[in-house]
């Protein structure tokens, strides 16, 4: 398991995201589009939305789990296939790739391009955001992405192996597709949103330590971090933890217009702060892996 994890991280660093035609996030999106219409055309939207979510997970998982099973007859092939599939469950370099485009646009004074690039990684409307608001949204995305895109999949990898990490990734994708509180998705996407809340609950709270620790390592941390003061301002019971911790660690005033303000007395975020947040992200990724994931994988190996 440790070799598979290290290999998966190496694949991410060297090659980045796999091609779309083998990526489970893309495949789950295609599955969703194929079957969604059928499940939405029913009165009991909560029940059928739940069945839809389970169906997407099962259908998406079949070819990947089958690939693992078939490859298991040859150890070397099994390890390589497992590395590739585990890699698809988390993202390290992809976050940097997306955020880099926003940073470069802001540095060049091209706020219109920055809004477009930001819109690819956030749910909010970016069309009228100013530079501070773009910076805030990017930093919030980095903080949340640490949990959704890395900590949670590997948390489940520790205890449930590749299937656990894989399902966690698809649940996160389902939440991003239909876990909204608008009229169309409030009932239909409720189960997807609930599953996403459950799987991220512990990793989100662990992020308090790893973001704070990483800010200390980088000599960024401004003050004692107390995210509890702000987490109640978020609709999500999980998102407030990494975002508030990042805001306090870097002493930034992060704001989603009309929704919440975190660390009210902090500085307005800038392009430089986006870069600092990415530094925290990378250190948090590797410290989480070394301090938390690897020791528990070793412990699980001895217990099982």
Curated annotation (Swiss-Prot):
Superkingdom of this protein's organism: Archaea
Biological pathway: Cofactor biosynthesis; adenosylcobalamin biosynthesis
GO cellular component labels: plasma membrane
GO BP: cobalamin biosynthetic process
Transmembrane residue ranges: 2-22, 44-64, 65-85, 147-167, 283-303
HAMAP family: CobD_CbiB
Family, per entry: Belongs to the CobD/CbiB family.
Listed name of the protein: Probable cobalamin biosynthesis protein CobD
Organism (species): Thermoplasma acidophilum (strain ATCC 25905 / DSM 1728 / JCM 9062 / NBRC 15155 / AMRC-C165)
